[in-house]
Amino acid sequence: MPTESASCSTARQTKQKRKSHSLSIRRTNSSEQERTGLPRDMLEGQDSKLPSSVRSTLLELFGQIEREFENLYIENLELRREIDTLNERLAAEGQAIDGAELSKGQLKTKASHSTSQLSQKLKTTYKASTSKIVSSFKTTTSRAACQLVKEYIGHRDGIWDVSVAKTQPVVLGTASADHTALLWSIETGKCLVKYAGHVGSVNSIKFHPSEQLALTASGDQTAHIWRYAVQLPTPQPVADTSISGEDEVECSDKDEPDLDGDVSSDCPTIRVPLTSLKSHQGVVIASDWLVGGKQAVTASWDRTANLYDVETSELVHSLTGHDQELTHCCTHPTQRLVVTSSRDTTFRLWDFRDPSIHSVNVFQGHTDTVTSAVFTVGDNVVSGSDDRTVKVWDLKNMRSPIATIRTDSAINRINVCVGQKIIALPHDNRQVRLFDMSGVRLARLPRSSRQGHRRMVCCSAWSEDHPVCNLFTCGFDRQAIGWNINIPALLQEK
C-alpha cells in the first residue's frame, strides 16, 4: 500500500493504459521499399559499422516482422469480437462467466527464432484463453439474493480497509489512501466524522470492542487511537437494487461515476489523536485490538509486529521473525491470540495467553504473498494470498490446510461471517465471492455497469446483526458498498 495518496491524473493514466491492451501497429499499404524507408533513412543517417549487405538483410527482416505483427493485430481484433459476441449471447441466456476478463497478462509469448513460430504461439495462446473462458462457465443454479443497498462515496482516493463498529451506535469506518478515515451512517450513507490526524495513507481502521474508540494505521509509520461521538441521522427508505448473485453484465471504464465531490468536507473533523503509537521504522500496514481492548497490535513493512499498552502507549512486545514486509494482522475475538501475514508467503500465530511467555507457530502453505489471515470463532484460521488461493487451517493441526479454495484472481483482505462461517473474498479483478468453510462457492456479488466495484476490491467486513446491510466491501474505485446477503437462502441452495 502506498504511503502517499494517488493523484487523479495517475488514475486516469492507469485507465488509459488498461484500455490500450491491444497491440497497436501502424497499418499501411505502401510498397516494400516505402515500408522500410524510415528505418533505412535512420540507419543511413548514423555512423554504422555494419556492412551494407547486413544492413539490407536487417531492414528486410524488419519489414517481414512488421507485416507479421500487423496480421496478428488483425487476428487479435477478430478474436476479441468473437469473444464479445459469445459473452453477449451467454449474458442473454442468463449465464455468468468467472474470470472472463481477457487481459494482456493472459497473453504470454516467448521470443522464437522465426516470425512464423511467433504467429503460431500467439494463435495457440488465444485458443487456450478462449477454451479457459468457456470451461469456466458455471452451471450452478444458485440464485441467492445479494442486494446492493448503499454506496458510501466521499473519499478522494482508493479505500484500503472497511470495518463496522461493535458498539452502539453502529457505524461504518473506512480507511483511505487520501490520508483520512471516515465514519458513515450505514442507513443513510452520510459521512458522520472525518479523522485527518495522519500525514500518510490510512491503511486500516478497527473499532474498540466496548468504547467509541477507533484505531488507525498509516503510512506515516504510526498508529493512532482517537475517540469519536456521533449522532445517527434519520434513515430514509432504501431503494431495491437487487440482482442475482450469479448474474453479471460487464462494465467498462466509461461507466464509472464521477466521484470527485468531497462530501466529507461537511463532516466534523478530528485532527488530534488521543494516543499515537510510535515504534515502527516503516509503513504501518494494519492494526487491531486484543480481546478486552487494553492492548493493540500493529503490523509494519519493517518486518515486525508490535504489541502496545493502550493506556500508556508503551511497547510491550516486538514480534520478529518474518523475512519480508508484513501485510496484515488480526486478533482472536475471545482469546489472546494474534496472527500476522507477510510477503514471505507465511503467516504466524502468536500466543499471549500465558503472560510470562509468548509462543509462535509458522504456517507455510502459500506460494505468494499472504495478504490476510483471520480467525473464526472456533479453532480455525482462514488465509488468503496473491497466489489466488484461500486456505482453511485447524489450529490443532498446522501441517496442512483442511480446505483449499482456488480462484482466478489474487485475494485481498478476507473476512468470515462469525455465525454462519461464510468467507467473503475480495479480488483484484473487481469480483467479490462468497464461500463456505468447506470450499463450496455460494455466490458472487453482482457487478454491472450500474452497480458494484469498478476497480480492485481491497477488503470485506461482515456485520451479521445489522438489519439493513450485513456485508461491506471497499475498493480502489474510492467507494465502499453495503450489501444485504440473504444467508438462509444462500445456505439452503448450497
From Swiss-Prot:
UniProt-annotated stretches for the region Disordered: 1-50, 237-265
A Pfam family that the UniProt record links to this protein: WD40
A GO cellular-component term linked to this record: cytoplasm
Chief subcellular location: cytoplasm
Gene3D superfamilies per UniProt: YVTN repeat-like/Quinoprotein amine dehydrogenase (2.130.10.10)
First and last residues of every WD repeat: 154-194, 197-236, 279-318, 321-360, 365-403, 406-445, 452-493
Subcellular location: Cytoplasm; Nucleus
Entry function: Required for normal ER Ca2+ handling in lymphocytes. Together with PACS1, it plays an essential role in stabilizing peripheral lymphocyte populations.
Subunit text: Forms homodimers. Interacts with PACS1. Interacts with PACS2.
Name the UniProt record assigns to this protein: WD repeat-containing protein 37
Organism: Homo sapiens
Gene name of the record: WDR37
